[in-house]
Curated annotation (Swiss-Prot):
Temperature dependence: Thermostable. Activity unaffected after incubation for 30 minutes at 30-70 degrees Celsius. Retains 50% of its maximal activity after incubation at 80 degrees Celsius for 30 minutes.
Subunit description: Monomer.
Species per Swiss-Prot/TrEMBL record: Ulva pertusa (Sea lettuce)
pH-activity profile: Optimum pH is 6.0-8.0. No activity below pH 3.0 or above pH 11.0.
Tree of life domain: Eukaryota
Propeptide: 21-53
Assigned keywords, A-Z: Hemagglutinin, Lectin, Signal
Record-level Gene Ontology MF annotations: carbohydrate binding
UniProt key word Signal: yes
Signal sequence, start to end: 1-20
Function: N-acetyl-D-glucosamine-specific lectin. Specifically agglutinates rabbit erythrocytes.
Record bears the keyword Metal-binding: no
Note: Divalent cations are required for ligand binding. Calcium is the most effective, but manganese or zinc can also be used to a lesser extent.
Protein name: Lectin
Length: 203
């Protein structure tokens, strides 16, 4: 069975124009994948819109994602408890490297901290290195609403990374019905408040 960490690390390299077959996937990269994220700062990409007050509320709809191939999960520590977020490969054919995220109560699912830029492959969002300092590689977590054609996932929020730190979204952990979710605390990209009816595919 192919090591999923090698696959994901390879996709991350490919997303920034590096061929993993040429440079190899180093042990330090794989080790980084095994680390834990403990803070998240978001960025809203210009081609989509963010609904302030929205967040990931997919835990109650976990069955919706059950049929999607699991690639892995990240473990996020907010200082008080751990929230697990799992990434899934979509079935909507928007791009074979487009991944989505949903919260999970399955605590055995742990680390994959890589998120996606639309059709551009996977990129690092943040990890903890051995000295316990954040490593972001210039990428930031962003929230994008699902395209209208994604009726199966209507009302859910997609997570992405983006390289523009000027468009920031601050996330917080909230508890609803005994379950924890990530929620937008502050949206610093006010143009994102204007949610269009249709989201044109970038590029």
């Amino acid at each position: 069975m192919i090591n999923i960490l090698h696959v994901i690390a390879g996709l991350a390299l490919a997303s920034v124009g590096v061929d993993a077959r040429q440079v190899g996937v180093g042990a330090d990269v794989l080790h980084a994948v095994e680390n834990t994220i403990d803070s998240i700062t978001g960025v809203e990409a210009s081609h989509s819109a963010l609904e302030v007050g929205g967040g990931i509320t997919n835990t109650d709809n976990w069955e919706t994602f059950a049929g999607l191939p699991l690639t892995g999960a990240i473990k996020v520590n907010d200082g008080n408890s751990v929230v697990h977020i799992s990434a899934y490969f979509p079935e909507d054919r928007r791009g074979k490297y487009s991944y989505y995220a949903a919260t999970s109560d399955e605590l055995q699912k742990t680390v994959v901290f890589l998120f996606v830029v639309e059709d551009d492959g996977l990129l690092l969002q943040a990890v903890k290195n051995n000295a316990h300092y954040p490593v972001t590689n210039g990428m930031y977590l962003a929230s994008h609403r699902y395209y209208p054609k994604d009726s199966k996932y209507e009302g859910m929020v997609r997570l992405m990374v983006h390289a523009d730190p000027a468009k920031a979204v601050i996330w917080e952990f909230v508890t609803v019905g005994g379950k924890q979710y990530l929620k937008v605390k502050e949206n610093r990209d006010y143009t994102a408040l204007q949610i269009p009816r249709h989201h044109p595919r970038p590029g």
